[in-house]
Structures are given as C-alpha cells and as structure tokens.
Amino acid sequence: MTEFRSGFVCLVGRPNTGKSTLTNALVGTKVAITSMRPQTTRHTIRGIVHRDDFQIILVDTPGLHRPRTLLGKRLNDLVRDTYAEVDVIGLCIPADEAIGPGDRWIVEQIRATAPKTTLVAIVTKIDKVPKDRVAAQLVAVSELVGDSAEIVPVSAVTGAQVDIVIDVLAAALPPGPAYYPDGELTDEPEEVLMAELIREAALEGVRDELPHSLAVVIDEVNPREDRDDLIDVHALLYVERDSQKGIIIGKGGARLREVGTAARAQIEKLLGTKVYLDLRVKVAKNWQSDPKQLGRLGF
C-alpha cells in the first residue's frame, strides 16, 4: 500500500501570473479571487486537494513585488513568511510573457528565504500561445531555475495538464496525515470568501488604480427572521478617495447594482441559499499607508 502524503504548497510569482486561477482549477472550485488586474489577492487562501493517497494544501499568496505602500510591504512580508513554512514552492510564470527582472528577483528571494524547499516551475496560460512559444518558454524557464526544479506547462482555463501539476506537486510532498477532512476545500471563513467575491465583482472593468485602493469588510450576516431560505449580508466597500467612490457607485448607482448582482450570485453558490446583499461604499483616506486603518481592514 502506498504511504499517504500530505503537505503545504505555495504558489508564487509576479502579480497576475495565473496563481489564483490555477488554485481554483487544482481544487476544482472557486476558493481564490481572480481578476485581470494585478495585485488582487490579499489573503493567504488555502485550497485543499483531496485524493485517496495524498492531500495538498495550496497557499495562494499575493504576487511578490517591489512595494510602494505599507500595504505592499505587509503583503511581501506575508509571502516571505509563507516561503519558509511550506513543503513545495510552485513558481508560476506565464507562457505569454517574456521572463524579466521581476521573475529573476523572485527566484533570488526564494533561494535566499527557502534554499532547501522543493521548487516546481509552472508555466501557466499555455492556451494563450502556439506550441512553439510554449516550448521556447519551457527552455527559458529551465535556464532561470536550473536543473533541480521540475517544470510543468498548464492551462488552468482549459484544464490542460492540471492533473499533471497535481501529480508532480503530490510526489514532492513528505509522508504525513490528512490535515483536513475529506470534502473540505478551504480553511477560509465564509465571511472572508464573501468579501473576496464582492471585491472581485467590484474590480471588473475599472481603472488600474482601483484594485490597490479597494477593501471589503463584511459588516453583518444574519438569517432573515421570517424566512428560512434567505440570509441578509451587509458589506462595506472602502476606497481612498471620493473620486474612487464615484467609480464604484457609477451613474445613478448603476455600477454598484451590477456589482451587487454579480457578487450575490457567487455568494448564493457559496452558501447554498438565497441572499439579500446590501453594499455601502465609504472613503477611508490613504488607508494603504495608515497602520491603524490597515489593522481595522484586516491587514
């Protein structure tokens, strides 16, 4: 009988390299926020992959980057702390972008912080380029990480090679117990997941500066007194400037209604029940650089 393996895998890379989409594909359901805007993941989301002979706990970190705000520095510290605590690091590099200084800097950070941790290089977004481009990127990644790291191409969107990535990561794990019961897919509290789903809906189609300036806090979750099949969710969306508040709300409140409709559909899937979603937008000036406000908003 094969020995059961289990452990923690950290997916790292520059912002917007497909880490959250890959986490969701590996787990088989949505546990991490995805957005075309960089730097949208702010919590270490753990997704859990269950099989008969192994269990992978996936840690989806913010993209490592050179920070410009106190929030950025705290996100980087979170990533480095995670490096030191996991069994395998999965370095995500997209097939459709040339390797640059940012990728080299991250490899240096990994080597400095966790020199003995197993490194697997994952070439993401292979559905976006022809096969010859994928092959060229595999060679370039091999030169970047060296012979000791295994390299796997994958498309989280189409599902191509997702099972191979799972097998490679599982093979690198040590023997160990199942940390989570079968069927549990994430250890994030439901309120955190709800806040992330609202944030994802609010980020769709907005200007580049907004992702960094938007935080969502779930204020209250209550079952409706006169209805067993309805839950009331009240959430606050914090931005840094009045102009950003206008972007979120839109003309006559149209955009906020769209955000509410999209987020409510996702939250109803998460909770398995009907939801009344109340969204309010508030300005918390320069919260990204204010330690007290960062703490209040969960950072």
From Swiss-Prot:
Region (G1): 13-20
NCBIfam families: era (TIGR00436), PRK00089.1 (NF000908), small_GTP (TIGR00231)
Gene3D superfamilies reported in the protein's UniProt record: 3.30.300.20, P-loop containing nucleotide triphosphate hydrolases (3.40.50.300)
Region (G2): 39-43
Keywords: Cell wall, GTP-binding, Nucleotide-binding, RNA-binding, Secreted
Record organism: Mycobacterium avium (strain 104)
Region: G5, residue numbers: 154-156
Domain of life: Bacteria
PANTHER family per record: GTPASE ERA, GTPASE ERA, MITOCHONDRIAL
Record GO terms (molecular function): GTP binding; GTPase activity; ribosomal small subunit binding; rRNA binding
Gene designation per UniProt: era
GO terms (BP aspect): ribosomal small subunit assembly
Residue ranges constituting the Era-type G domain according to the UniProt record: 5-175
First and last residue of the signal peptide: none
Protein's UniProt name: GTPase Era
Protein task: Exhibits GTPase activity. Binds RNA but is probably not involved in ribosome assembly in mycobacteria.
HAMAP family: GTPase_Era
SUBUNIT field: Monomer.
Residues engaged in binding GTP: 13-20, 60-64, 124-127
